Amino acid sequence: MRLKGVLALFSFFTAIPIKSNASLEEIAEYSYISPLIIGISLALIESAVYVLLYRILEALAGIVLLGVVELLRGFNHLDGLLDLGDALMIKGDRERKIKALKDVEIGSGGIGLLLVYLSIQIVALLKLGFSFYTIFYLISSNVLSMTIGLYILSTISPIPESNLGKIFHNKLKGKSTVLLFELIPFISLYNIIVFLVFYMIMHKICRSLGGSSGDIAGASITLSFPLFLLTNEITNLNYSLLSILCYLFLYLH
């Protein structure tokens, strides 16, 4: 495994200032490990910031954390969310939907989907609270959301217009099983249901557009994160390997 390709994952998926001259092909080649490397790294940073903010702002720390979450991601996936929202609002043939997906202007569909995301995200972050489990909620949610975006790229053929989608699909199409195995420590019974339902919805959307793309994967990562986080908070990560390890840690100490 080349260090250059691994470090390039940070410059591609986040706003963390790590210089890399890796090509898109090299990034795509190692992207299957990004849920573990990038997902856990982001969760650790978010947890540290949240702890500091909570000491000052208490429950309102979740609102500030929303900005931190998007800032760490460089707002990259938000662009995909806005584009997908515009495409979903288009009535008509596939060509018109793809034009909206590629359009740089933001329409009512993009704004609408953004409001849906912000509403769910704010509720999830306000409910985050402060406990021993907070960091594990964030780790699980980051890993799961990144995995579902990459799993979509690996299992659904890309639209002809998406160069990024083609590159990632070619590099990931043999890695879908690996992506699922990476989930084992972090996914609960309830999140399996969320994962499957979310994937089926995105699969149907991809069919209407003619395939997957970088925008669709980015939108999936963005929109699924608060859903997984909210599920983790409500169910306390029950029936997951991560929760078992937490219980053992607390019991032994």
Curated annotation (Swiss-Prot):
Cofactors that this protein relies on: Mg(2+)
Molecular functions per Gene Ontology: adenosylcobinamide-GDP ribazoletransferase activity; cobalamin 5'-phosphate synthase activity
Catalytic activity: alpha-ribazole + adenosylcob(III)inamide-GDP = adenosylcob(III)alamin + GMP + H(+); alpha-ribazole 5'-phosphate + adenosylcob(III)inamide-GDP = adenosylcob(III)alamin 5'-phosphate + GMP + H(+)
Gene Ontology CC terms, in alphabetical order: plasma membrane
Domain of life assignment: Archaea
Entry keyword annotation includes Membrane: yes
Enzyme Commission designation: 2.7.8.26
Transmembrane segments: 33-53, 56-76, 106-126, 132-152, 178-198, 209-229, 233-253
Gene Ontology biological process terms from the UniProt entry: cobalamin biosynthetic process
Keyword vocabulary terms for this entry: Cell membrane, Cobalamin biosynthesis, Magnesium, Membrane, Transferase, Transmembrane, Transmembrane helix
NCBIfam families on file: cobS (TIGR00317)
Function: Joins adenosylcobinamide-GDP and alpha-ribazole to generate adenosylcobalamin (Ado-cobalamin). Also synthesizes adenosylcobalamin 5'-phosphate from adenosylcobinamide-GDP and alpha-ribazole 5'-phosphate.
Protein name in UniProt: Adenosylcobinamide-GDP ribazoletransferase
Organism from which the protein derives: Saccharolobus islandicus (strain M.14.25 / Kamchatka #1)
